[in-house]
Design a protein with these regions (language model features):
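Active-site-adjacent structural segments surrounding the nucleophilic cysteine of cysteine proteases
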Residues: 1-89, 158, 194
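Short secondary-structure junctions and interdomain/linker hinges
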Residues: 76, 107, 132-139
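Stable alpha-helical elements in mature extracytoplasmic
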Residues: 34, 39-46, 96-100, 121, ...
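Active-site signature of cysteine proteases
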Residues: 122-124, 128-131, 138-195
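Catalytic cysteine-centered active-site loop
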Residues: 106-122
Length: 195
């Protein structure tokens, strides 16, 4: 953990009040049933959050938006709706930025850059959040989530401990997740384009 970020009270809350937190449970039984669909769920949260922040809320129901996003990933083999042998399926860590870009274009959300994936360190996550970005976080072998994709909207430091403001796709509200470097894998950064 990096020392300069551990000042108690330090926060990044640019997105507070605009965060969406749909869950995988809301979409699991759609169509033929979705499996390993945390990636499309996180991107659905992202699309709703950015559209709301831009003052152009989506008129489509979340289920319709989710289906379109899962379809975008499925057509490009970025998202596979399978859980073959509990090993294969879900959203590709490396290709998720392409799925995010295409999803934003599909819903008319412009003016944002999608960069990554990068190694997800506390320093990088906090620096990007301080710049007003949203961080799409991918964790591997997490003690609670296992392999999982979710959104990070901000952070706070309490008692020297970094707490990330997460839409984890499991809980229908934003909540704080204690951060430890060993828990992070990759991150993709979604931020306002400069100029």
């Amino acid at each position: 953990m990096f020392k300069e970020s551990l000042d108690t009270g330090r926060t990044s809350t640019f997105w507070k009040g605009n965060e969406y937190c749909f869950t995988t449970g809301q979409f699991a039984k759609l169509d033929r049933a979705y499996r390993k669909h945390c990636g499309p769920t996180a991107i659905t949260n992202l699309v709703y959050t950015l559209a709301g922040k831009e003052g152009k809320p989506l008129s489509e129901k979340p289920e319709a938006v989710f289906r379109r996003i899962a379809g975008i990933g499925g057509k490009r083999l970025i998202y596979m709706n399978t859980d073959f042998l509990k090993l294969f399926g879900g959203t590709s860590d490396i290709l998720v930025p392409f799925m995010i870009r295409r999803s934003l274009r599909t819903f008319g959300i412009t003016g944002y850059s999608v960069r990554g994936p990068f190694p997800a360190t506390a320093r990088r996550i906090c620096a990007e959040l301080d710049r007003g970005a949203i961080v799409y976080l991918e964790v591997h072998r997490h003690p609670v989530y296992g392999n999982h994709h979710m959104l990070c909207y901000g952070y706070t430091v309490r008692d020297g401990r970094l707490m990330l403001r997460m839409a984890d796709g499991w809980v229908g509200r934003v909540h704080d997740l204690p951060a430890g470097e060993e828990l992070f894998a990759l991150c993709t950064v979604i931020s306002r384009q400069k100029g």
